[in-house]
Amino acid sequence: MNGEQQLDADAGSGMEEVELSWEDYLEETGSTAVPYGSFKHVDTRLQNGFAPGMKLEVAVRTDPETYWVATVITTCEQLLLLRYDGYGEDRRADFWCDIRKADLYPIGWCEQNKKTLEAPEGIRDKVSDWDEFLRQTLIGACSPPVPLLEGLRNGRNPLDLIAPGSRLECQAFQDSLSTWIVTVVENIGGRLKLRYEGLESSDNYEHWLYYLDPFLHHVGWAAQQGYELQPPSAIRHLKNEAEWQEILAKVKEEEEEPLPSYLFKDKQVIGIHTFSVNMKLEAVDPWSPFGISPATVVKVFDEKYFLVEMDDLRPENHARRSFVCHADSPGIFPVQWSLKNGLHISPPPGYPSQDFDWADYLKQCGAEAAPQRCFPPLISEHEFKENMKLEAVNPILPEEVCVATITAVRGSYLWLQLEGSKKPIPECIVSVESMDIFPLGWCETNGHPLSTPRRARVYKQRKIAVVQPEKQVPSSRTVHEGLRNQELNSTESVMINGKYCCPKIYFNHRCFSGPYLNKGRIAELPQCVGPGNCVLVLREVLTLLINAAYKPSRVLRELQLDKDSVWHGCGEVLKAKYKGKSYRATVEIVKTADRVTEFCRQTCIKLECCPNLFGPRMVLDKCSENCSVLTKTKYTHYYGKKKNKRIGRPPGGHSNLACALKKASKRRKRRKNVFVHKKKRSSASVDNTPAGSPQGSGGEDEDDPDEGDDDSLSEGSTSEQQDELQEESEMSEKKSCSSSPTQSEISTSLPPDRQRRKRELRTFSFSDDENKPPSPKEIRIEVAERLHLDSNPLKWSVADVVRFIRSTDCAPLARIFLDQEIDGQALLLLTLPTVQECMDLKLGPAIKLCHHIERIKFAFYEQFAN
């Protein structure tokens, strides 16, 4: 099953992809959005074309048949705040109106349409001669254009006037100042897809510009500025001169009404530059904005425009990249700007060294550096900061807009990492005033496609997916392929689904279940839980585990919130029922996906079961911890909580496990502690239990004569316990790897009652005192023959040591050797005290491990000492 099928299966089981939630995405990534007001070009687009001070003829509110002059006080999208002329500074009569619904007309409309122009009642007595008042107040007045009012009345935004098919004039910004007609193919929120007049869509010369781009103008601009209309050099070769002139003549004959010039009133005003030919500077190549390189002013067109060429020291036959600039063009810097800002400057192609030096380069070229005064002042006050999110145009694929993260800010320039791009690209450099960047949500608002990172895709959770195990056994090939894909994909799913989205948590019921959990009940659990929110998924997992325990209240106590916790997660109240009593305790659960794997592992260790019993990884036929060699009677050798140097709880640090049935009056005298809990803190936990809680480990211990760490050790064996004993006996029979019978093998030949008695005695010998040496039978080594080594252990690597440990019955300890990077030399130096201290092992496992180390030492002296 491939990755796509896996994703589809997930969606079908309870997850469906929905629109991107920016609030959730920002929370997951730990970032913030760039403030909306930082994008001036977008803010301008939202203006309705009106400006404070404009005058209109407006219907009088108390008498709709009459009209009067009103002044625009302020604007807010489609709303205007108006004040009738004559009220002066009195704001009490100000009123709001909706442009699309109100009767608003330009000055002179009433006279043309023979409508009554009369002052409202509230001010009629203030002025004696209203005709003279109007003549004075309308001197120099500005009124909105008629097309604007008509368009707004029809529900159209001013920007909507730039409709597909509209014509504009576009300057060639690559190598010359030639201007040519372009046709609007698409307008998405002011971002225009343009096609040169005379070309078809199949010619692949369409390009994107924002409508306020300084190189885009209304039709007639070239004639006003004295520029000739001619196709840019990039497309000139596609037709001969006669064909281009024919196209131009056809456009002029059609005489379409040009787009109103007021649409471009907010365009940047081009100032006068002071650059001269042969000046050197630093520049960002607009066609490849991924670095800063040396460049040269190669041509000055006029007082407003000049041509910059990226330096290239290779032979002349290489194509040169140039672009037209003006005084305020972004992406050009004075010499040494990169050095002053701690940035790397890329040497020009053909430069003999990777270490570029401006002084040597200027001397070599015989050129001068452009003085600082030629460059516009940098914008120091802006709201762009590192790790903020925005939307940005992909400079390689201009039709694509991606989510972007600001990775660096230098003055008024940003380094952006685009996420979710069809083709991965390096960080690109843009100005804070670039018209190719937009606030988060711009694409969604304007219907523009947005490329989002995979981990940002939000899935709506119908319910936490619980996959039940199949009753029908599939073919072995299908099973193995499916499991392999799940194992490969499980580690990636944490990042794919976001910071707070937990991957599937698998219950690997074939793994060692430890002393608290019933193997039979675990086998009945769902195959997996999730994916979904970390807290919800892990809460469900822990609830299922608690219910699969011999004593749910005991497992709940093991899982309860610890004051020394390092997870910094959230506390969730979980419940357990045992023998008619309800218990609840606060359990800490991690909130982020990156901690799920370790949380599951540590929880398994806390419950003294195989670290792979549950987690994001599905175990195949063989567990990596080699837990199949373990039985319930041996759990103390391998897994257990490791509370370093902590004897009992601190004062007041009692268990937070509370019983729903408070029976303080029935509190009995606690019996002598014959069976001390294996956890060091348990005795203190008993002493400090609140009066309202059941005594001992939450209350159930007082009622049971079989008080031990494990309900399976009780006198009255239940059906689950018998099943457990039978499973362990079968496991021991399959194991049989030694010439002499092992302790577990001997137990299989005994009657069930003998087995139970034997199990109790053996386990009690460990839970009585964890530092008490085990009996000789208990530490009996299954493989006692002399060890023969194929290589010198002094030269073993960490991997060699781990490989050897995994081959023994101490396989679960191999991870410690890997984590502590114990190689062959370190292995030969280990002794029982150092093993106990450094590896934090109990005496039983430490003795068993040291036995294997002694075997290695003996073989070393015998085979390699000479």
UniProtKB/Swiss-Prot annotation:
This protein's name:
Scm-like with four MBT domains protein 1
Entry's Pfam families? MBT, SAM_1, SLED
Q: Where is this region: Antigenic epitope?
A: 34-42
Residue spans with biased composition (Acidic residues)?
A: 699-713, 721-730
Q: Name one GO biological process term.
A: cell differentiation
Spell out the residue ranges making up region: Disordered: 641-777
Q: How does the record comment on the protein's domains?
A: The MBT repeats mediate binding to histones tails; however, in contrast to other MBT repeats, does not bind specific histone lysine modifications. The MBT repeats lack the conserved Asp and aromatic cage at conserved positions.
Question: Which keywords appear in this protein's UniProt record, sorted alphabetically?
Answer: Chromatin regulator, Differentiation, Nucleus, Phosphoprotein, Repeat, Repressor, Spermatogenesis, Transcription, Transcription regulation
- What are the MBT repeat spans here? 20-120, 128-232, 242-348, 356-453
SAM domain boundaries: 796-864
To which species is this protein native?
Answer: Homo sapiens (Human)
Per the record, residues carrying Phosphoserine are: S767, S775
The membrane spanning regions, by residue number, are none
Q: What function does the entry list? A: Histone-binding protein, which is part of various corepressor complexes. Mediates the recruitment of corepressor complexes to target genes, followed by chromatin compaction and repression of transcription. Plays a role during myogenesis: required for the maintenance of undifferentiated states of myogenic progenitor cells via interaction with MYOD1. Interaction with MYOD1 leads to the recruitment of associated corepressors and silencing of MYOD1 target genes. Part of the SLC complex in germ cells, where it may play a role during spermatogenesis.
Give the compositionally biased regions (Low complexity).
737-749
Cellular component aspect of the GO annotation: nucleoplasm; nucleus
Q: In which tissues is it expressed?
A: Expressed in all cell lines and normal tissues tested, including the thymus.
